[in-house]
Every structure is written in C-alpha cells, then in structure tokens.
C-alpha cells in the first residue's frame, strides 16, 4: 500500500470538507444563514418546502459529496425548519438530496467513467452521463416534493 499516495488524496478531501465546514460556520455566525432563511420564509411555507430539496440537491451537486453538501447547507435547512416547524423533515430532505445528487456531480461522473474505461471501450461520454444523471435527479426532485407535501399535509412529522 502506497501510504504517501493515500495521504495525498486524503489531504485534498479533508481540506475540502474543512473548507465547507468553515464556510458554513462563517455564514452561520455572520447571520447570513438567518437572513437567507428569513427571506425564503417570507415567500410562504409552500414555496419554502418547494425550495428545500433544491437547496439540498444544489449542495450535493456542487460539492460532489453528501457530507460536504450537508456541511455547507444543513445550518440553513435547520433555520428553515425552525421557521416552519418542520426541522426533522427539512434536515432529512437535506441529507437525502445532497447524498443522492452528489452522484450526478462531475467528480463522480469522471470517476465512474475512468473505472468503466478499464473494462470496456463502449462507455458513454461525460455529457451523456451528466444528462442521464440530471434526468434521474429531476425524477428524484419530484419524488422529494411528493414526500414533503404529503408529510407536511398530513403532519406526519412534528
């Protein structure tokens, strides 16, 4: 096992996570999260519930990591949940959407394609994989909306 190579890879990943955590805490401490949450909450509960999975999906896609997405946007989802009395629902949605959408990010696509090229020459292009991933993410978004509005309407989570 090449420990030097593993350490090089780990440093980049850990550095990215630390940066997302620092950015998240900076946004939280400076009141930025509260300001964004209040602005979104002023749009009404239905629009807020609609935007929650978009926030989570964006964070997972942007960071290429469910953990990184959560580190970046979970404080915002917690604030939105507190404003709508749906903390459990919105934090669950953040965790799920960030994790699922990370698989459509470019780092995941490049990794999957690189591995596939070791075993086959008939591998879709990055663009084809991204288009497929975004179609799946769109379907997931609709399922998340159905879940959110069902749970919120029937008040399954308090």
Which ranges hold each PLM region?
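Membrane-interface interhelical connector segments
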Residues: 31-45, 75-79, 84
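Alpha-helical transmembrane segments of multi-pass membrane proteins
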Residues: 46-60, 84-107
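Hydrophobic transmembrane alpha-helices that form the pore/transport pathway of multi-pass ion
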Residues: 62-96, 120-125
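Selective recognition of specific alpha-helical transmembrane segments in multi-pass small-molecule
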Residues: 8-26, 138-147
